[in-house]
Amino acid sequence: MRVLQACAEIFPLLKTGGLADVAGALPPALRALGADVRVLLPGFPPILDGLQNAEEVAKLSPPAALATGGARLLRGHLPACDVDAYVIDAPACYHRSGGPYADAQHQPYAHNHLRL
């Protein structure tokens, strides 16, 4: 079976709550059952920092880039999670002050529904 797991965060690279724990534990568990697992993640800086052997596999156009700055799809390996990954690298969406979901004043980003 081939599995593509889409998630907003993954332990140990980016964690705000329990979602990251599950997202980090599920790929190895599925692989142990014989599945071919990949993950799809947003390009938050900690995720990009953990991505090894990254190569661009596609250029993305709006709405993926929210009409500013462009975006690209990277493929690489996340050794901290021992999983191959696709990462949406869109700096206008994911390189922000504050956390992944809210700004430095803890206000949710207005366009989270587009980013995630």
Residues of each region from the PLM?
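Catalytic cores of nucleotide-sugar-dependent glycosyltransferases that transfer UDP/GDP/TDP-activated
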Residues: 1-116
